[in-house]
Swiss-Prot record:
Description of how the protein assembles with itself and partners: Interacts with PDCD1. Interacts with CMTM4 and CMTM6. Interacts with CD80.
Gene it is expressed from: Cd274
Annotated protein name in UniProt: Programmed cell death 1 ligand 1
Annotated effect of mutating Y56S: No effect on PDCD1 binding
Signal peptide feature range: 1-18
Originating organism: Mus musculus
Tissue specificity comment: Highly expressed in the heart, thymus, skeletal muscle, and lung. Weakly expressed in the kidney, spleen, thyroid, and liver. Expressed on activated dendritic cells, B-cells and macrophages. Expressed in numerous tumor cells lines of lymphoid origin.
Length: 290
């Protein structure tokens, strides 16, 4: 803020009270990941002399934009705003030192100071708030086989913290065992997971609502208890598997028996052939002796 103090001191010394800058809005509320343009207007009587214009945008102790000698000086710019903050020159020519920030982060929230020197000096403070609605709600339903209870789970990311409210199809609060866990993402968003254990039947409807006090910031997901899968198909499959195993066993046994029977027959034939040969040899011997 040394620059700010120097400009104000210069203005006071020269008593240039006629130079006044205006801010159409002193509060901007934007969504995480969106773009924002914060306006800071100053008087331009004739054609703007860019070389005589000095503009500073600061956020607390962080340098956001520095415009001197007719161009932006990025050297002192804080790393948090590198590549995301700019001061459109076409707006400067209209007397509007508009600060544009793209892909707004949670850490961008805070109080900004617009300081302008152009024949005189003045400043304005502008507040930026960042919200991240819990729009994308992931859900899951599971059944505890031991207790037959259904566990309903809703998970979403956002900022600031939201309360998770569970209701039934009549939008009445639901009693049951609940738990909530909260963690931080890399982008500093809050990762909120809420679970509810209830006794329910198929087609029962439940709602989980990520509730915040601001209007239009509430988001709801619907969970419908699914029907239990039919038990017949698994039993039928078991029967078919068992029957197939039995048939395969019988085929293998039959094949083995046929093979063994064939081997026995071949042995019998070979045995008969040997016996016939032996008998013939004996008969030939007896004939020779005679």
């Amino acid at each position: 803020m040394r620059i700010f103090a120097g400009i104000i001191f210069t203005a006071c010394c020269h008593l240039l009270r006629a130079f006044t800058i205006t801010a159409p809005k002193d509060l901007y509320v934007v969504e995480y990941g969106s773009n924002v343009t914060m306006e800071c207007r100053f008087p331009v009587e004739r054609e703007l002399d860019l070389l005589a214009l000095v503009v500073y945008w600061e956020k607390e102790d962080e340098q956001v934009i520095q415009f001197v000698a007719g161009e932006e000086d990025l050297k002192p710019q804080h790393s948090n705003f590198r590549g995301r903050a700019s001061l459109p020159k076409d707006q400067l020519l209209k007397g509007n030192a508009a600060l544009q920030i793209t892909d707004v982060k949670l850490q961008d929230a805070g109080v900004y100071c617009c300081i302008i020197s152009y024949g005189g000096a003045d400043y304005k403070r502008i507040t930026l708030k960042v919200n991240a609605p819990y729009r994308k709600i992931n859900q899951r339903i599971s059944v505890d086989p031991a207790t037959s209870e259904h566990e309903l789970i809703c998970q979403a990311e956002g900022y600031p913290e939201a309360e998770v409210i569970w209701t039934n199809s009549d939008h009445q609060p639901v009693s049951g065992k609940r738990s909530v866990t909260t963690s931080r993402t890399e982008g500093m968003l809050l990762n909120v997971t809420s679970s509810l254990r209830v006794n329910a039947t198929a087609n029962d409807v439940f709602y989980c609502t990520f509730w915040r006090s601001q209007p239009g910031q509430n988001h709801t997901a619907e969970l419908i208890i699914p029907e239990l899968p039919a038990t017949h198909p698994p039993q039928n499959r078991t029967h078919w598997v068992l029957l197939g195993s039995i048939l395969l066993f019988l085929i293998v046994v039959s094949t083995v028996l046929l093979f063994l029977r064939k081997q026995v027959r071949m042995l019998d034939v070979e045995k008969c052939g040997v016996e016939d040969t032996s008998s013939k040899n004996r008969n030939d011997t007896q004939f020779e002796e005679t």
